[in-house]
Structure formats: structure tokens, C-alpha cells
């Protein structure tokens, strides 16, 4: 039995109320969901709360899952949305439109690609140092594979703003790594 068939069977068992299937879903996806939430919230307790709430929502709305996307992707979207919702409640996040004129010039000018090897921990530290809006967009796109268009809709900002912030986040990470770990 392949992964998709196994996953689909697990979803169907959950839909029928099989408690063992709920347990299996939780143990299969909890860590992945926690990591996604942590990349947004940067707080273990809040991230754990969002995972719990997300599982409750997912199990309550299991009938709405249509197999158009993967079940794992569906769960990740729920926890990402819950995490962003918590941030909005707490901070009323401010998104500033950024000027796109210099970005094309930077890309065209280019820069020599210095080859560096960094540990996962060094990269995670550099990401954690980003301003919150940079960190969120970088993680959603680069780590959670959410499209830039979808990020724009989630955060209620323009696509070009997402693109610019992502580009600047990458540059800040690169700069941080080169300055810190040369």
C-alpha cells in the first residue's frame, strides 16, 4: 500500500469515527504542524496551542476535505491560518508596501556567488533574526511551500509585496550568515 492510499484510508477511518485513526493522524502530523506553527509564532507554548486547535478544527471539519490537495497539506494550511490569526489578534500586524524599483536593479546587477557551507542551526538562527514579517513570509514560501499568491491572500497584502519581502528576507539571511560565520 503506498503512502497516498494509506493516508486516504486513514482519513476515511477518521470520518467513520475510528479513535485509533485519530491517534495515528495526530502522531503522524503533530510534529510537522508544530514546526510550521513555530516558524510563524516563534513561541513553543503558542505553537502547541495552535496545533491542538488545528487538530480540533480538522477533525470537526473532516467532511470538507475533498482530496483535491494532500491531507498533510490541508492540515498544514489549517495550522498556518490559525497561527497567523493568533498573530493578527495579538499584534495587529502592520504590513508596509515596499518600493519595487530597486529590486529589479539588484537582481540585474547580481553579485558573485560565494560558496559557504552552513549548518541547519546557523541557518535557523539567521531566519529567527529576521523581522517578523520577513520571517513569516520566508518560512511560508521557502519552508512550507505556500505559493506567493496564496501568501498574499492569507496576509491581505499584494503579490508584489510578498515577492519583495521574500527577496529581502533571503538577502538578509545571506548577509547574516556571511557576516556571522565567515
State where each predicted segment sits.
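A short, charge-rich alpha-helical start-of-domain segment used by transcription regulators
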Residues: 11-34
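Amphipathic, Lys/Arg- and hydrophobic-enriched alpha-helical face
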Residues: 26-44, 61, 127, 172, ...
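Structural recognition of an alpha-helix C-terminal capping motif at a helix-to-coil junction
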Residues: 35, 49-56, 69-81
Amino acid at each position: 500500500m503506498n503512502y497516498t492510499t494509506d493516508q486516504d484510508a486513514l482519513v476515511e477511518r477518521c470520518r467513520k469515527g475510528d479513535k485509533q485513526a485519530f491517534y495515528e493522524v495526530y502522531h503522524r502530523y503533530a510534529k510537522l504542524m508544530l514546526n510550521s506553527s513555530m516558524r510563524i509564532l516563534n513561541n513553543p507554548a503558542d505553537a502547541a496551542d495552535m496545533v491542538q486547535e488545528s487538530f480540533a478544527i480538522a477533525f470537526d471539519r473532516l467532511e470538507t476535505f475533498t482530496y483535491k490537495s494532500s491531507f498533510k497539506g490541508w492540515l498544514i494550511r489549517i495550522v498556518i491560518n490559525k497561527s497567523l490569526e493568533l498573530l493578527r489578534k495579538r499584534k495587529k500586524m502592520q504590513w508596509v508596501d515596499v518600493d519595487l524599483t530597486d529590486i529589479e536593479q539588484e537582481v540585474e546587477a547580481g553579485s558573485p556567488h560565494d560558496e559557504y557551507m552552513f549548518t541547519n542551526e546557523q541557518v535557523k538562527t539567521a531566519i529567527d533574526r529576521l523581522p517578523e514579517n520577513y520571517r513569516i513570509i520566508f518560512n511560508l514560501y521557502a519552508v512550507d511551500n505556500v505559493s506567493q499568491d496564496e501568501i498574499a491572500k492569507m496576509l491581505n497584502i499584494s503579490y508584489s509585496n510578498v515577492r519583495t519581502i521574500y527577496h529581502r528576507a533571503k538577502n538578509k539571511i545571506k548577509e547574516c550568515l556571511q557576516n556571522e560565520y565567515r
